[in-house]
A protein has these predicted regions:
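Conserved segment of the helicase C-terminal RecA-like domain
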Residues: 191-204, 345-374
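Conserved SF2 helicase motif VI
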Residues: 176-187, 191, 332-355
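Post-DEXD/H (motif II) to motif III coupling segment of the RecA-like Helicase ATP-binding lobe
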Residues: 161-165, 170-235, 241-248
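Conserved strand-helix element at the start of the C-terminal RecA-like helicase core
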Residues: 82-90, 100-101, 105-120, 250-276
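N-terminal pre-P-loop "Q-motif" helix
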Residues: 54-77
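Conserved helicase ATPase core of P-loop NTP-dependent helicases/translocases
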Residues: 118, 131-143, 283-310
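A short beta-strand element within the Helicase C-terminal
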Residues: 163-169, 306, 317-330, 340, ...
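Interdomain "pre-motor" coupling segment immediately N-terminal to P-loop NTPase/helicase cores
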Residues: 1-45
């Protein structure tokens, strides 16, 4: 037996009901019986031969990466775009998007997290004002077809055999990474090529590159040409960490800069927010927060000085002149990939390409050490020649 959706072949994950077997592994995406064929979804296909509208011209490095990506895709190869945070991964996809749309092909953009889906959709609307863009995620399922579809990886179950180009952002992010069901659904949604974006590709992805199954394009230079922010690691007790968080948030506020304070658990965020609110305007966002979008809008509009958050906001959110402090950085929830993404929030703006990233911890574990090493290595790859 084999499930035609998630490719499950484990007998223990099939159930028997009224004379038929069905798959329990992907039951969350509706019941699918064994031997039941999945029909291709019918979507609009528009031929569009236009160009994206950008606020700035791509750098020479971005143009080269963009060209290489489209060249590999045009040759029928899947591509991993390994680019540092803030390098402009989304914009580098635009040449490929235009190339596929010019041929009347269907383009989809899938991301693990709902917040990032909304942000990417906004950026695509700005770059492609002549095209219809729809976001498909929790709370946004009324419209499921447009010239370009942006959805969570969970929502890809709606699109079997749909996309000639499927762009998978945050390849290494929860819940997509390591999830066999979501990965199988993504593979089924793509009838052409996959363009996979990551600042922290995992070992399996890099193995596909070594085995020549996937092409690799790298870009570690940000458009403003300033180095990535290497975090300052401070090893102190939890009590002193709290005092440093308060001090740094007040200091940044006086400099008219906002702060993201990352905590490992909701309960850490709850009491830390209460303490910080005594000194600066502070709010809290985590997975159970009901009004996430409203709080994020307030932070973007500078109505808040500090936003305490869990790793929910480690990716996708872009705030000019934001500073980052990680509290209890040696907690297991802060993996190397997570920390690289978190400190990648700093220094993304052309107007303020510098900033501070501070990792507070009781001791520097391997994740912290690897984070510092990998960010430094990316900088060395780009700027080593200028240091000599």
């Amino acid at each position: 037996m084999k499930c035609n959706r998630c490719q499950n072949e484990d007998p223990k994950l099939f159930a028997y009901d009224h004379g038929v077997y069905y798959c329990r592994k992907c039951i969350d995406f509706s019941r699918l019986e064994v031997n039941e064929k999945i029909k291709p979804v019918k979507l609009m296909h528009k031929t569009w031969k236009g160009k994206p509208k950008l606020d700035y011209e791509l750098t020479a490095s971005q143009k080269l990466a963009s060209h290489d990506v489209y060249k590999h895709l045009s040759n029928g190869k899947d591509v991993i775009l390994y680019a540092s945070t803030g390098a402009g991964k989304t914009e580098i996809c635009f040449e490929s998007i235009c190339g596929y749309l010019a041929q009347g092909k269907k383009v989809g953009f899938a991301i693990s997290r709902r917040q990032v889906v909304l942000e990417i959709a906004t950026r695509l609307r700005k770059a492609f004002p002549e095209l219809s863009i729809c976001e498909v995620a929790q709370g946004y399922t009324q419209i499921t077809d447009a010239d370009i579809i942006v959805c969570t990886t969970h929502q890809l179950y709606r699109y079997p055999y749909a996309f000639d180009l499927l762009i998978l952002d945050e390849l290494d992010a929860f819940p997509f990474a390591g999830n066999e069901v979501l990965q199988a659904i993504a593979n089924q949604a793509c009838v052409g090529q996959k363009l996979m974006l990551s600042a922290t590709p995992d070992e399996e992805s890099m193995r596909f590159v070594e085995e020549k199954k996937t092409e690799l394009v790298c870009l570690f230079e940000r458009p403003h040409k300033h180095p990535l922010i290497v975090p300052k690691v401070i090893q102190v007790s939890v009590f002193l960490q709290v005092l440093i968080v308060i001090y740094e948030c007040i200091k940044f506020c006086r400099d008219n800069k906002q702060t993201l304070v990352f905590v490992p658990r909701k309960r850490d965020g709850t009491w830390l927010k209460m303490i910080l609110n005594l000194f600066v305007k502070t709010s809290l966002v985590h997975s159970s927060t009901e009004n996430k979008d409203e709080i994020l809008d307030c932070f973007r509009n500078k109505e808040l000085d500090v936003l305490v958050c869990t790793t929910l906001l480690e990716r996708g959110i872009t705030i000019p002149s934001v500073q980052v402090v990680v509290f209890k950085g040696n907690h297991s929830v802060f993996t190397t990939a997570s920390l690289i993404q978190i400190f990648g929030r700093v220094g993304r703006s052309f107007k303020d390409p510098k900033g501070e990233g501070i990792c507070l911890c009781q001791f520097s574990n391997q994740s912290i050490k690897d984070c510092v090493y990998q960010i430094s290595k990316m900088n060395d790859t780009v700027y080593a020649a200028t240091k000599k």
